[in-house]
Amino acid sequence: MEMVRLSKLMFTFCIAVLIPTIRGNISELDEYWSQRADEAREFTLQAYHSDPYEIVDHFHERHYDNSTDVTTPEEDGDAKPEEEEKEFIEMLGSSTNSTRRSLRGKGKGKWSKLKGPCTASNPIDKCWRCRSDWAKRRKKLTRCVRGFGHRTTGGKRGRIYVVTSNLDEDMVNPKPGTLRHAVIQKEPLWIIFKNDMSIRLNQELLINSHKTIDARGANVHVAHGAGITMQFVKNVIIHGLHIHHISESSGGMIRDSVDHFGMRTRADGDGLSIYGSSNIWLDHISMSKCQDGLIDAIVGSTGITISNSHFTHHNDVMLLGAQNTNEADKHMQVTVAYNHFGKGLVQRMPRIRWGFVHVVNNDYTHWELYAIGGSQGPTILSHGNRFIAPPHKPHYREVTKRDYASEDEWKHWNWRSDKDVFMNGAYFRQSGNPQYKCAHTRQQMIKPKNGLAVSKLTKYAGALDCRVGRRC
């Protein structure tokens, strides 16, 4: 108990020192932003788990709830424990060694040619995808999140807000019906889209707390403009967006709340930027071709799950912790699960400083330099992933890359691999305690599927073509 108190005290000190000195894209840290930063510090402390292994267990826990508004195992197709071995064998039945993905077309009709019963194959998707009435039960999605973001509820307690316009013309007084007008509201909101649309953001989109952006039922692209920022906020869900061709923006006067706007400096061109924020869930997102990173989570952000997403054509994919001197990221906790890291990716899938990251059942079919990297002694648990090394680059077959440390230092970092599958000569250089075992109980833990199964587990990664009245 004393160690836990000491850990939280040190974390509070790190955050207190850090927040006044790092402003992100805020031109002037006025009273409003100072208050937001103070609140973010408290949110981060609340979201931080002193025993992260408990959340690793929670990720694999099956939730059976007898309440009337929860999908039962029979409804969502969840296998009973005695059926798991049979299910796993069936999952291995078709081309597990293939690196090709059968996407059956592009864009609007991506999944329309799929025939037969719904085949949601991972626990998050099983929770909701195979129900034809999902549109009437949108907010039940919050029951499906797992991992470190498991407390995230987004706009569950708010009303539905329908985005009717793709325009983004006024940064200070956005028009009702636009995405920018929706995300700056102070109240919880569940944001959906009236129809298919492509939104070109003229400046970074600043999301307020307690929001869900739910693109199910429409084909929504945020593209060819600025990216999306979550700064000093909590409790945000982003689901089903296509985010691509994001470029840097010049900054200027931008409204971030109904009662505040201020001067923002240049934004680097990240697709999704999580800055000093907590309880964030990113699910079923398709991302590519952003000027800087696809996803950045920095400055003490924690309680994050990134799941079921598809990443392609990018250099610096995912950065978790941006500075070697920023000890506020020491308690960053992130789950990366059921994602497909696909064509045209180079590195950082993810790249971690300081934090604790659970990388589970992801499919790494392409990289150019390395897949998972880090510095400053992060803890990385790699469970049940498939790593396929680049066939044309024999010198880049190592999955891992350690920076800014000699072997005498990094050999103590706890980077462990279990149930991973390696192809084309790929290998994971482990470090830390070779006898390390994550504490699992039968009540809490379902072990990760073997890496051979990830082609099935990640088959529907990325934004889905969900249509009202039909299964996704």
Curated annotation (Swiss-Prot):
Name the UniProt key words of this record, in alphabetical order.
Calcium, Glycoprotein, Lyase, Metal-binding, Signal
Q: In which pathway does it act?
A: Glycan metabolism; pectin degradation; 2-dehydro-3-deoxy-D-gluconate from pectin: step 2/5
Q: Known EC number(s)?
A: 4.2.2.2
Entry keyword annotation includes Ribonucleoprotein: no
Start and end residues of each stretch annotated as Disordered: 64-83
Q: Which residues are glycosylated?
A: N25, N66, N97
Question: Which catalytic reaction applies to this protein?
Answer: Eliminative cleavage of (1->4)-alpha-D-galacturonan to give oligosaccharides with 4-deoxy-alpha-D-galact-4-enuronosyl groups at their non-reducing ends
Q: Where does Ca(2+) bind?
A: D268, D292, D296
Acidic residues bias: start-end ranges: 72-83
* Entry annotation: catalytic residues: R348
UniProt keyword Metal-binding present = yes
> Which cysteines share a disulfide bond?
none
* Co-factor requirement: Ca(2+)
Q: Which GO terms describe its biological process?
A: pectin catabolic process
Offer one Pfam family short name for this entry: Pec_lyase_N
Q: Which family does it belong to?
A: Belongs to the polysaccharide lyase 1 family.
Query: What name appears for this protein in its UniProt entry?
Result: Probable pectate lyase 19
